[in-house]
């Protein structure tokens, strides 16, 4: 069960790294679209009809609203990227340390990032460490 836990944690850590990289790319795209450099592109798209919105007002007001939305999306994906990075760090650390505290930390950050594979690996690790503790004699009883 320990080996299965270690495998799930390593695969989950790699998955978190890949997901974090994808979130970083999406964050960069939204930041670029939120800059004033993309104002002309969006304004031209609104006037030509290639960019469709149901917003009331002038196209200039719609561009400002769209850029605010892009900036808020960049912030959301940036936060998700940070959580994925932390998840990758703690999950790979849990695969290496194999302690109950590391497994619990991996469960918490796996839940916060939305990556399910580290959750399974950490739960398997907790079960395996609990079985190992039951096999050891308790010196307090003897």
Indicate residue ranges for each PLM-predicted region.
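Intrinsically disordered terminal tails
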Residues: 1-4, 43-46, 131-142
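Perimembrane loop-to-helix junctions flanking transmembrane segments
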Residues: 38-65
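Membrane-embedded alpha-helical segments of small multi-pass membrane proteins
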Residues: 3-37, 67-96, 100-134
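Glutamate identity and glutamate-enriched acidic tracts
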Residues: 44, 56, 60-61, 84, ...
